[in-house]
């Protein structure tokens, strides 16, 4: 009767209000996007200038793509407070002032590796921390390792260089931490960037504790983090193994992969083919783990 109709109308009104609120929030995000992108661009430019790397103009195709990914995936960051609770933002990260132990950020890598630039950008923008990122060496080469296939996108090497990226190796990690630089390392490397079908969020980390021993030797603080969303953002149609086995494109990829280094078991620089499924990225930084009490031997 009347009560049922009133309840129905109230429910419709509440739904309309909720929809209007969501639309207003979305409009606010869209309106703020240019400001966030400009802040990110200026942060990148400042980092590059400090390293003597000129800021390219106009922005590279890779940077334009990153801007689109930022809007599409809306990364959200959390850190762990003294009580062990996750709180929004990065204010709870350990001190990073001069003289503080270097931080070694360790976490899972997500499909296609967009998480790396997102973390670098957020740490620089929110905390003023310029990380040194250890990346797959071919990503820092001027020519695409898969040429003439334009992957990675033009401008990737220059952007990574401006952001302080260095070719990943044990020696590079030692140099970075010994200089007191806060460092980002994805132990799973390219193997996690180009996961196969059915491997969402699986870790492919080496069994060796060498990284922990090195951190202890240099009195670095381990800062573990977990990333979510990236492996849900792509539906893989053909994974790396299927492309390598393809009679059509397999010879092309096999020839190029044979010339590239392998840093993690079974890593191959062959991007899967699939569909983008926009999903928010989440990054949760855990409590810091000092290594001053660990025997590096």
State what each model feature region is:
Residues 3-5, 10-41, 47-65, 175-297:
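Non-catalytic C-terminal accessory region of glycerolipid acyltransferases
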Residues 10-122, 127-171:
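Membrane-anchoring hydrophobic helices of lipid-metabolizing enzymes
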